Amino acid sequence: MDGIIHIGGTMPRIGTTTVGLQLVLFLQSMGYEAAYIEMNRQDYIWGCENLYMDCKQDKLPGKVSIHGVDMYAREWMPELISGGTHYDYLLCDYGNTHRPDFDRKGFTDCGAMVIVAGVKPNEIFATERALRNPVFKEAAYVFSFVSGEDQGEIRNMMRDKARETAFMPYAPDPFDGNPFRKGENTDCFMEIMNYVVRTGGDRDGQVQTDSDG
């Protein structure tokens, strides 16, 4: 399933959707076609449709564009992949990975997995639980709300997953892609995509920067 990235969080409200949307915007800034797929039932797209004035219903069935991000509900995923897609990447947001109805089998059927985690007192045990879960053995980890001075300690805590660990920059607006266009806040997402390439989740085998031409 090349080009398909599945994102899940260790618990609710950990920042999973923000990471997914920011990753879409980062890939767009790199010249790739990317879309966000809501694979959970939190009705985020519905909320955006009723909140943002620039929400556009596309002629393509199921497609909603909000602040330049193409978004689809989970029902459209089979159609997006059955006959091929013009998107280079599909970012699939599975939400909380520890809810009772979480689709473990579906989550692993992809090019790469990303787990969004945290280190606050109410988050660290959920993070450790995810690390012990064999379902997420091949996943990369993105930590939200971690200060720069604490990142080294977190990498040490991650041990053999340190290479697959990244830290989400401050992003109060998940639809704000301006930092990427300025070349800012890119480290986290370059680390994620380097992992995607290593695990075979990239459609053409590489992530090119502007300097690569």
Role assignments for model-derived ranges:
Residues 19:
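Hydrophobic positions on the alpha1 helix immediately C-terminal to the Walker A/P-loop
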Residues 47-58, 129-132, 151-162:
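Short, aromatic/basic amphipathic alpha-helical patches
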Residues 137-213:
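C-terminal lobe/tail of nucleotide-utilizing enzymes
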Residues 32-35, 90, 113, 138-140, ...:
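Hydrophobic anchor at the start of a short beta-strand
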Residues 100-121:
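Inter-motif core of Ras-like GTPase G domains
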Residues 105-110, 131-138:
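Short, conserved loop/helix-junction motifs that constitute active-site signature segments
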Residues 3-14, 22-25, 29, 33-100, ...:
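P-loop/Walker-type NTP enzyme "switch/lid" segment
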